[in-house]
Amino acid sequence: MAKAIALGDVARGRTAPNPNVGCVIVQGGEVVGRGATAPGGRPHAEAVALAEAGARSNKATLYTSLEPCAHVSPRGSPCASLIADAGLARVVAALEDPDPRTAGAGFAILRDGGVEVDVGEGEAEARVSMAGFLTRLALGRPRITLKLALSIDGKIALPSGQSKWITGEDARAHVHLERAHSDMILVGRGTFMADSPSLDVRLPGLEPWSPRRALLSRGDPVEGWEMLRSPQDVFGLHDVNDLLVEGGSATATAFLAADLVDRILIYRAPILVGAGKSSVGYIGLDAIADAHGRWRSEDGRSLGVDRLEVYERVRGA
């Protein structure tokens, strides 16, 4: 299962609105088929793995990070039917698909076809890998990650506005990897006017996976950019699983005040700025007690001279 989830994780940011599924077929202890959801969402991971395995799928075990689909599309039969027809003996899935078009129906097709089904292995890891898709199905909007590059004392720029570069090359390379795993990246009008950002991916081999660009602004449309008039417009992004917000203080504040941020990436540099621009303004909290319990620390590690801190929103808090 770990291999299947890893395959799907590589495809994150390329498959929306479909999930980034990974699949492995094992026959006699040997991996005979591998697949991940293709760019654009089709073909599905299971179909790719079945095509590679061919006749070796018969009586084999298929590991998939998500329940095989059960709905018929113009592009072909549902994956659950393909698996049953291929004669596999067993399917191990990490998660049931929350998409109402499947939602257990894929497992029913498999069982009706004589395929043994086990669910739950690797569930926690699969939820992390497909967090964007799962968030969109649950909340009706993309999973939103806020990226902040800060000094030790929490500043994003000097009083003059100068901010290039607070962090070093390793931290900036990690940001580009996050971009490659996002379907869309957003900045505010202030960042757009000050920096004219390209927001592309500049890592060798990943340049084709630069995300779509969005601008949070009530101004005139800008060619090559998708416009969001307010943070609440994210509920209209039905074809985006993962949204990365890279704007300045005003944009960060707007999304946090609207409680639309699911994950925060803080790239903290070992520098002191003193008087400077703060990362976030007023977000509606008037008591320290109300701030506690809303976020949990998920990760922390060094990136060259800098430090990455990852925080996840605790929903319901």
Residue spans for each PLM region:
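Enzymes that bind and transform nitrogen-containing heteroaromatic metabolites
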Residues: 1-16, 33-34, 52, 57, ...
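Generic alpha-helical structural signal
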Residues: 2-5, 111, 127, 131, ...
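Proteins enriched for Cys/Gly/acidic motifs involved in redox and nucleic-acid/cofactor modification
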Residues: 13-15, 42, 107, 121-149
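Helix-turn-helix
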Residues: 22
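Zn2+-dependent cytidine deaminase-like catalytic core
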Residues: 25-125, 253-256
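Structural motif corresponding to alpha-helix initiation and N-cap regions
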Residues: 43, 76-77, 123, 127-131, ...
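Short acidic, glycine/serine/threonine-rich loops at helix termini
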Residues: 74, 103-106, 130-131, 157-161, ...
